[in-house]
């Protein structure tokens, strides 16, 4: 999964790496990645990355208070795992930064979050490339061919 890959990359830079998951990951812990309960994780880390399924809520107003200010939040999820008004309030505090790959999860390119100076949003899905687009189209055509050959 993406979170595990990110954690291992950060270890290569000799960073202290922590994670939270509903299920413990002994294989990650054996590599030196430390598990923390979510509340404790928020109070411990300076940078938090989220790697969740679409429409999975994670943080509310109280969680952002625990996370605090002077932090970086990175979201790789297609949707925001927190209410946008709560995210906006947190971003209005000094020293907070938000990095996200697509504008859909922050209300679009015409939304006020997209235009905030402490938000980095290239509005391109991180895994998107010309090659991935070609491969996707090939897969769609293969699926159509397979379906038509059996029906």
Identify the role of each PLM range.
Residues 24-112:
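Rossmann-like adenosine-cofactor binding region
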Residues 18, 34-36, 120:
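General small-molecule cofactor/ligand-binding pocket signal
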Residues 7, 15-16, 96:
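Residues at the starts of beta-strands that form the adenosine-phosphate
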Residues 1-11:
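Glycine-rich adenosine-cofactor-binding loop
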Residues 97, 105-151:
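C-terminal helix-to-coil terminal segments
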Residues 9, 18, 62-72, 146-147:
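P-loop/Walker A phosphate-binding loop and immediately adjacent motor/lid segment at beta-alpha junctions
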Residues 11-30:
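NAD(P)-binding Rossmann-fold cofactor-contacting core
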